[in-house]
Amino acid sequence: MRALITFALLCLLYITVQGKVSTPKVHVYSHFPGEYGKPNTLICYVSSFHPPDISIELLKNGQVMSDTKQTDLAFEKGWQFHLTKSVAFTPEKGDEYTCSVRHMKETKKFSWEPNM
């Protein structure tokens, strides 16, 4: 009987965790301060999301950038997840760099601000 109650509680916990949807928090930044014509690394850090149904793309002027690197999916306390995607780039005046994040069925874009 004790095992049955424990199993039921674990099932309830699993259903509760699986049913909770957390919208991702997104930060787009560069490794060094943005300077036009200077090599840098564009980084998109996505955190605090659940479930882990997510895809991240780095875009230059709306086109997917090649040679990107992505960390393995990792989880935080509360079964929320985080990922980082990055790419080497050299910002040029007039170019727009964005991070496109699709979580579940919703896609949002976040822009890199060079602060120049």
Curated annotation (Swiss-Prot):
Keywords for the protein's UniProt record, in alphabetical order: Disulfide bond, Immunity, Immunoglobulin domain, MHC I, Secreted, Signal
Signal peptide extent: 1-19
InterPro entries: B2Microglobulin, Ig-like_dom, Ig-like_dom_sf, Ig-like_fold, Ig/MHC_CS, Ig_C1-set, MHC/Immunoglobulin
Localization per record: Secreted
SMART domains: IGc1
PROSITE patterns xrefs: IG_LIKE, IG_MHC
Record-level GO cellular component terms: extracellular region; late endosome membrane; lysosomal membrane; MHC class I protein complex; MHC class II protein complex
Gene Ontology molecular-function annotations: MHC class II protein complex binding; peptide antigen binding
Domain Ig-like C1-type: 24-111
Disulfide cysteine pairs (residue numbers): 44-99
Gene3D superfamilies referenced in this protein's UniProt entry, alphabetically: Immunoglobulins
Pfam families registered for this protein in UniProt: C1-set
GO biological process: antigen processing and presentation of exogenous peptide antigen via MHC class II; antigen processing and presentation of peptide antigen via MHC class I; immune response; peptide antigen assembly with MHC class II protein complex; positive regulation of immune response; positive regulation of T cell activation
PANTHER family named in the record: BETA-2-MICROGLOBULIN, MHC CLASS II-RELATED
Quaternary state and interactors: Heterodimer of an alpha chain and a beta chain. Beta-2-microglobulin is the beta-chain of major histocompatibility complex class I molecules.
Function text: Component of the class I major histocompatibility complex (MHC). Involved in the presentation of peptide antigens to the immune system.
Family to which this protein belongs: Belongs to the beta-2-microglobulin family.
Name used for this protein in its record: Beta-2-microglobulin
